[in-house]
């Protein structure tokens, strides 16, 4: 089985995939910069227990992160729990995605993962939208080519800013 971990600014999403590629469980944890590798291991073990799976059956893991301060601890936790390090999405990882930008290394791991996932499910051209703490919009053309995209404040960030800066707009 494959354990996929996506560290976002607000939540850490984890998904367990069977050998057939089917999603077995999807769970979320709070993104907490203070957690140690041991605490992350306990959190992950609890998720496996909650969903009635054995972490010992996981053969591989992959890590995607937009929170660099947590990468080391998560890599350490996954290595300790599963007995080998995760594949970390980032520059140098072969995804089959052609990035048509001047500085390819500036494309976030989350954007690469969104694009690759979309290409596995749909035929290009594709527009991806990921609505998290930040909203990202990506454009993928024929030939598995990432053309570029937009990075915008997420819905909650926008609502918080509006309620703070606009006198007659209350927080909702």
Task: Show where each model-derived region lies.
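N-terminal/domain-start alpha-helical segments
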Residues: 68-73, 77-80
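Short glycine-rich phosphate-binding loop at a beta-alpha junction
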Residues: 55-66, 85-87
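Catalytic phosphate-donor-binding core of small-molecule kinases
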Residues: 168-172
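Phosphate/pyrophosphate-binding loops at sites that engage ATP/ADP/AMP, CoA/4′-phosphopantetheine
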Residues: 44-60
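Short glycine-aspartate micro-motif
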Residues: 2-6, 62, 126-130
